[in-house]
A protein has these predicted regions:
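Cleavable N-terminal targeting peptides that direct proteins into the secretory/outer-membrane pathway or into
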Residues: 1-30
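Short, flexible loop/turn elements at secondary-structure junctions
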Residues: 3-5, 16, 102, 182-184, ...
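Long, low-complexity, polar and repeat-rich extracellular regions
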Residues: 16, 27-28, 32, 203-205, ...
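Acidic, small-polar-rich N-terminal luminal/periplasmic segments of exported/outer-membrane proteins
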Residues: 30-173
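Structural signature of outer-membrane beta-barrel domains
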Residues: 44, 92, 119, 168, ...
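Extracytoplasmic loops and strand-loop junctions of Gram-negative outer membrane beta-barrel proteins
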Residues: 125-127, 145-146, 174-177, 212-216, ...
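Transmembrane beta-barrel wall of Gram-negative outer-membrane proteins
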Residues: 175-273, 298-317
């Protein structure tokens, strides 16, 4: 009887503890519950509640991005309903398909935007689709994916999928994050981000990453290397705000289209490109101009994107919002079977 009484007391104690924990968890969940606001698909990017949007839009915030752990920008789009993604030849040059729109490759029905401005208007150019010109890191606050709806009017005439990446912004409290990532294929990556207040009503966010790797399929040299640095400055005004951001990216990775692997004497985990076979010289134009090509440079994005916006509110509900974006050099090399 004593044994049974002890078990009953233990059961009561456990039940009480679980009930208390459940109550605390419910209270915390209630405190953390916030309404999702979307800006994609609205005139001038004016935020509305997601529940009030009359079109299909997906929100993925920074915490969800960490959980999904995408291997590339295009890989993140797998979380969007109605979107199918394949990596094709590597981190760059993915194929992105949108439900209801026919396509044979690349990403003809995808537009990638940053802070509401399209990064690059051409949806496909020699395997150089939109996601090849953008890298995800800890400076991203959220990604919004708008399928159809007002896309043709409020995007760059895109009837399919428009994805909008919004950068983190500074606040009154200074905070930061440092992250180191490694893998069984010798990936070495360091991410960092810091945000805070410079002076009254002037806020900053800076961050980026540095990485290197011989690749999942060992190339015999550092075939995947890159870095990125982002600055975002926001000035709050009495009747609006000013925002400016710039992002410098130099990130390239090996790009292999399908090659024979199930062949005697060939190691599928190692590429035969090596350091001696990756050099080539090609001749173009009527004057046979020579170009030295190094396949080790891979495919990627070498350049920078800068942009900004001004938002002003006036009497009687009038608003003025303007955005700008500029981008520069793209260089890319890859090995294609043929």
């Amino acid at each position: 009887m004593k044994f049974n009484k002890a078990k009953s007391m233990l059961a009561c104690a456990i039940t009480l503890a679980l009930s208390t924990h459940a109550a605390v968890a419910a209270e915390q969940a209630k405190e953390k519950k916030v309404e999702r606001i979307v800006v994609s698909g609205t005139p001038a990017g004016v935020g509305i509640r997601k529940i009030d949007a009359s079109y299909a839009v997906t929100n993925i915030d920074s915490s969800q991005i960490i959980k999904l752990s995408p291997k590339s920008t295009a890989d993140l789009f797998k979380a969007v309903p109605g979107v199918w993604v394949e990596s094709s030849g590597g981190e760059s040059g993915a194929n992105v398909f949108v439900r209801g729109f026919p396509g044979g490759g690349d990403a003809p029905f995808l537009t990638l935007s940053i802070e509401g401005s399209p990064v690059y208007p051409a949806p496909t150019l020699s395997f150089l689709e939109n996601s090849s010109l953008f890298r995800i890191d800890e400076t991203i606050e959220t990604m919004e994916a708008l399928r159809g709806g007002p896309n043709p009017v409020l995007s760059n005439g895109q009837p399919g999928l428009t994805t909008n990446f919004r950068l983190k912004r500074g606040g009154e409290d200074t905070q930061g994050l440092f992250k180191y990532t490694t893998s069984d294929y010798d990936l070495q990556r360091v991410d960092a981000v810091v945000s805070g207040e410079i002076t009254d009503d002037l806020y900053f966010m800076v961050g980026g990453y540095v990485k290197s790797s011989p690749g999942i399929r060992d190339a015999g040299f550092t075939s995947e290397k890159g870095s990125q640095f982002t600055i975002n400055i926001t000035k709050e005004l009495d009747n609006g705000e000013l925002n400016f951001y710039t992002r410098q990216t130099d990130d390239h990775g090996a790009w292999y289209l399908p090659t024979p692997l199930n062949v005697n004497g060939i190691d599928a985990e190692y590429t035969q490109l090596g350091t001696l076979n990756r050099q080539a010289t090609i001749f173009t134009g009527p004057n046979a101009q020579a170009h030295d090509i190094d396949l080790g440079d891979g495919r990627g994005w070498d350049g920078h994107v800068s942009g900004g916006s001004i938002k002003l509110e006036f009497d009687n509900g009038w608003q003025f919002i303007d955005r700008l974006l500029v981008y520069f050099l793209v260089s890319t090399f890859g090995m294609q079977s043929g």
